[in-house]
């Protein structure tokens, strides 16, 4: 049977990595910016455990929405696509013992993804919005995640008082200053984020950030080892995913 995976533009490498790690006998036929064609004897419904593509279809025109998550019933404006959240977790190279911080958690798509599909130890979810925290709580309940594996805080990033250096990874969908916030606000917010990371991140910790503010993120993290991993086409915007580590 021939299949087509619909993917986010810029995510080929990660979709192929997931597909071939879970189904190593897959025969890749063709690759394009927004789709991958492959052949396999496996039935289409078995591919529901692929989380980085957005859709899969077969030659009989049956289509599955792979980005839909049953637990994700609450949403926030400018929230992250669940497939993209999964890709960011792949880039972070998550481990079971990791403690994750998302300081702009929205409805907690990234933290829930990290716990459910990468089995990390625990996550700390922070957002300035009361509504986001309420929606996060509901999504965690929907996902049936034990309460001792997550903490939710309604805080402005400038008011976060955590000081213990025990965070293994920070993953976040940052304010772009386009759909949410402004560039001037982002200068302050991103500067505070760098200070927070410097305070809380372990020596060998990792930071994975999605942002449209490409120049700003490089300026703010100029004393870190920062790399742009890929540019993603997300609804007409072209943010980049940055991987950042201590020098």
What are these regions (language model features)?
Residues 1-23, 29-44, 60-247:
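Class I S-adenosyl-L-methionine-dependent methyltransferase catalytic core
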């Amino acid at each position: 049977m021939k299949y087509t995976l619909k993917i986010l533009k810029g995510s080929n490498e990660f979709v192929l990595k997931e597909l071939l790690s879970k189904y190593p006998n897959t025969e890749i036929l063709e690759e394009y910016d927004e789709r991958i064609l492959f052949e396999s004897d496996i039935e289409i419904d078995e591919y529901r455990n692929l989380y980085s593509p957005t859709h899969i279809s077969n030659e009989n025109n049956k289509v599955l929405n792979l980005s839909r998550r049953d637990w994700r019933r609450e949403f926030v404006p400018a929230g992250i696509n669940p497939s993209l959240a999964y890709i960011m977790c792949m880039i972070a190279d998550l481990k079971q013992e990791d403690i994750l911080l998302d300081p702009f958690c929205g409805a907690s798509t990234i933290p829930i993804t990290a716990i459910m599909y990468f089995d990390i130890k625990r996550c700390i979810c922070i957002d300035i919005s009361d509504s986001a925290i309420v929606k996060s709580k509901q999504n965690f309940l929907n996902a049936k995640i034990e309460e001792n594996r997550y903490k939710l805080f309604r805080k402005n990033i400038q008011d976060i008082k955590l000081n213990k250096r025990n965070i293994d990874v920070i993953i976040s969908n940052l304010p772009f200053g386009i759909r949410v916030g402004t560039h001037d606000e982002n200068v302050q917010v991103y500067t505070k984020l760098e200070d927070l990371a410097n305070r809380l991140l372990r020596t060998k910790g990792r930071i994975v950030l999605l942002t449209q503010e490409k120049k700003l993120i490089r300026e703010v993290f100029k004393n870190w080892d920062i790399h742009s991993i890929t540019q993603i086409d997300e609804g007409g915007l072209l943010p980049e995913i940055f991987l950042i580590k201590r020098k």
